[in-house]
Amino acid sequence: MIKIYDTLTRSLREFVPIHENTVNMYVCGPTVYNYIHVGNGRSAIAFDTIRRYFEYRGYTVNYISNFTDVDDKIIKAAAKAGMTTKALSDKFIAAFKEDVAALGVKPATENPRVIDYMQDIIDFVQILVDKGFAYESSGDVYFRVRKSDNYAALANKTLEELEIGASGRVDAESDCKEDPLDFALWKAAKEGEIAWDSPWGAGRPGWHIECSVMATTILGDTIDIHGGGADLEFPHHTNEIAQSEAKTGKKFANYWMHNGFVNIDNEKMSKSLGNFITVHDALKTMDGQVLRFFFATQHYRKPFNFTEKAIRDAEINLKYLKNTYEQPFTATVDEAVFARFLEKFQAAMDEDFNTANGITVVFELAKWINSGHYDQTVKDKFAEILQIFGVVFKEEVLDAEIEKLIEERQKARAARDFTKADAIRDDLAAQGIKLLDTKDGVRWMRD
């Protein structure tokens, strides 16, 4: 039984899908105006791991992750670069796909782009206006927050707390709003900006409405899981809930999941703070699989401090698992003991996808394998578990010359010619091949 920590209820809840053996997930993707930073990469890795574990447990997963390609940041970045907004978005969508592929993230079932859903967005906003949940003002359209029941429940706040937080903050939209808490569904076009015709004049959608429209258009009025970074709880996901449920009269998502921040020197990594490392740059000096495994060692909801030491530790641990995976088979495998490892792993991961505890079990299993319990069945299951964390090892094939040297050393040992055997061992070590003599025969690993 899989349990999920639901941000909305602040509780661990048993996962019950809307449709049997199927998971419909929507995860907020990047605003494509720059390379993603490592914090964005963690979100992609976290939800890919969750997706993979659902699949490991036998579910079919419809995994939708959008590209926000209509946004103020894109307009500004495109103008600065002397590019069209579409050309800029296309560039960074391609970069995103390349970066997350290097992190072992599977392609989404679908990556919707805002630009392809403009009429759906306009229709959605019109319904909210018709139902009295939204109003037009000077070409903008705003959502009436006070008409929404339990508006800020996801953020665990009251309207009074939001009002206090908003006091003293006056923006260019304030004079157009009925209430300072109201948020934009549609923005009137400014001169020179990309725009679409609508019943309220030329303009473009607000950020929050975009995800509501894409999620419900593709997956239906109610989805199983909606995910994203913890920074999206308010206002983005809060506003998504308000506008979606106002339109449909139904619950928008049954489970809300949020991954923790990545910190640099114990401070949240973000583009606004200027303390970020892009995945694009990180991959120039470290292996994507190492970076991914680094994040898997911490529970997805917890903040993570990005340090060089932690990366080095992840690299060492991955090397150990690789050497374990490449071991030759042994004669003895206790199926009952192996089954208990699998049960223990599942119990760890069923508890809100606790990768930290799950990986602890993986290393216990590796230790058992290295003590002489390995056959094809164990190897196949070991590989299946590792791929949940994006770890896929290619089969190492020794070239004929090295195979011949190992065989010659075995013959020398059998003839008790230990001088020759040691010389061959040293020759192999110089080529990066480490030999281990065990009761089950010789084993080798890349050093």
Swiss-Prot record:
Assigned keywords, A-Z: Aminoacyl-tRNA synthetase, ATP-binding, Cytoplasm, Ligase, Metal-binding, Nucleotide-binding, Protein biosynthesis, Zinc
Annotated cofactor note: Binds 1 zinc ion per subunit.
GO BP: cysteinyl-tRNA aminoacylation
Zinc is among the record's keywords: yes
A GO cellular component annotation in the UniProt record: cytosol
Record's keyword annotation contains Nucleus: no
InterPro entries: Cys-tRNA-ligase, Cys-tRNA-synt_Ia_DALR, Cys-tRNA/MSH_ligase, CysS_C, Rossmann-like_a/b/a_fold, tRNA-synt_1_cat_dom, tRNAsynth_Ia_anticodon-bd
Binding residues annotated for Zn(2+), in chain numbering: 28, 211, 236, 240
UniProt motif 'HIGH' region: location: 30-40
Catalytic activity, EC: 6.1.1.16
Motif 'KMSKS' region positions after renumbering to this chain: 268-272
GO molecular function: ATP binding; cysteine-tRNA ligase activity; zinc ion binding
Residues annotated as binding ATP: 271
Cofactors: Zn(2+)
Subcellular compartments: Cytoplasm
SUPFAM superfamilies: Anticodon-binding domain of a subclass of class I aminoacyl-tRNA synthetases (SSF47323), Nucleotidylyl transferase (SSF52374)
Superkingdom per UniProt: Bacteria
Subunit structure: Monomer.
Family: Belongs to the class-I aminoacyl-tRNA synthetase family.
Protein name: Cysteine--tRNA ligase
Gene source species: Streptococcus mutans serotype c (strain ATCC 700610 / UA159)
Lineage of producing organism: Bacteria, Bacillati, Bacillota, Bacilli, Lactobacillales
